[in-house]
Amino acid sequence: MCIRLLLGYRQLGKAGFLQAALKNLDFLWTGWDDELGGGIYWYKDRSSKNACSNAPAAIAFLLAYQCTGNEEYLEKGKLIYDWMNGALRENDLFADNIVVETGAKNHWKGIYNQATMIYAGSLLYEITGDETYYDLTRRTVNATLELMFREEQTADGAAEIRMNGNPIFKAWCVGWLARSYVKFYETDPAKDTKPMDMLKGVLDRELLTRTEDGLYDPFFCSGQSDPDNVSELLAQDGVASAFLCAAYYNVFLR
């Protein structure tokens, strides 16, 4: 919610959006403590600290800094980002969570967690110009290419890019992957086109999955299926977000 409010404030200038976001950030920070060296809890039972509660929080605090210039938000964004890299980074990807009582980790590498850390790292590089953030982010981008995509040959010998199903979880996670790749490209001095080229290859195939009802495959032709998920609004939002990011990239960035 904070991220959407802050992006809405930047686009529309509505003070109410900013006020609501900052109030929510105050509450969000109550989930941070020094157990396991820091990090924000996933839930009020304080049993685990998850990538999906920390990486988006880092984004929100960094956006709040960009909207207000308040250094406190920048410092909190850095703290969260640094904690993620210290506690959950594994071979340039991010584990799902760590249990507070035992320190045990869930090593699943969901794409949402990778995408939000790419976005957070891109913001930090954009704000600070510190090459450390760029290097960490670039390495995660490259790791997601191996995690998410595979190249196959069609019957006529043509190359075809496909997505691996397990890291997807939900289509809205791929929407976040598209946002993060666009944000990385915007800040990347090398202007590496490979991440978006790979994603666009998947989206070209995704266009062909449109049903008579106007719905798309929420697993992006990866081979996974969930009939109950096809008509879910959140699933189709993820597809639409990925299409919009690709269109923005093609029209405004290339």
Model regions: which residues?
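CBM-like carbohydrate-recognition segments
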Residues: 8, 49, 132, 139, ...
